[in-house]
């Protein structure tokens, strides 16, 4: 699902393989006479949503001088985005940069197709169970998710990229549980 999407032929084939394996297990229990005394519990680890683009908030933090790139990595920063797929933590090291960072994120959100649905304050984020050390939490809009890079603001998601960049996905998780269809 991460590489190809929720309802992709590849995801459906994987579900069929799991169904066959479960059928083999249940058949073996029946054959061994253990069916009545065995409890089989099947759990799913998480839900996902299809995505079309990855969003990189650090692009604007670097551009605004709130973060510096050295030797291919963000080294010095006053504000930085840390991805959590459908959500993104924004950390601000310098308390005097909180308002500037909030203004920058608000401007990002105002752009057409920003990929950002909501921004939560530190207090709102902590009440949701998020890291109380963050300054903000962003939730991605439908079809988007976050990544930590800085070279560009957005990048097309999907399986065609999976050989060159594992983090470019076609479906992901990490959204708030009140999300429609999640």
Regions found by a protein language model. Give the residues of each.
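Secreted, luminal/periplasmic, and some membrane-associated catalytic domains
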Residues: 24-168
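Glycine-rich, often proline-containing surface loops adjacent to acidic residues and nearby aromatics
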Residues: 1-3, 84-89, 182
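Short, intrinsically disordered, charge-balanced linker/junction segments flanking boundaries
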Residues: 163, 169-182
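A generic structural signal for solvent-exposed, polar alpha-helical segments
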Residues: 10, 156-159, 181
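Generic structural "secondary-structure junction" signal
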Residues: 5-6, 92, 130, 177-178
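Intrinsically disordered, low-complexity N-terminal regions enriched in serine/proline/glycine
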Residues: 3, 58-59, 174, 181
């Amino acid at each position: 699902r991460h590489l190809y999407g929720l309802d992709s032929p590849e995801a459906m084939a994987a579900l069929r393989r799991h169904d066959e394996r479960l059928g083999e297990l249940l058949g073996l229990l029946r054959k061994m006479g253990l069916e009545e005394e065995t409890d089989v519990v099947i759990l799913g680890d998480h839900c996902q949503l299809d995505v079309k683009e990855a969003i990189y908030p650090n692009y604007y933090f670097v551009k605004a001088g709130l973060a510096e790139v050295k030797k291919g990595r963000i080294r010095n920063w006053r504000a930085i985005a840390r991805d959590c797929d459908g959500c993104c933590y924004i950390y601000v090291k310098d308390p005097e940069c909180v308002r500037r960072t909030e203004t920058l994120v608000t401007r990002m959100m105002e752009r057409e197709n920003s990929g950002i649905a909501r921004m939560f304050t530190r207090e709102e984020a902590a009440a949701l169970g998020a890291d109380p050390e963050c300054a903000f939490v962003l939730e991605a809009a439908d079809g988007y998710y976050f990544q930590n890079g800085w070279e560009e603001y957005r990048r097309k998601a999907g399986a065609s990229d999976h050989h060159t960049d594992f983090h470019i996905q076609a479906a992901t998780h990490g959204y708030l549980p009140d999300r429609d269809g999640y």
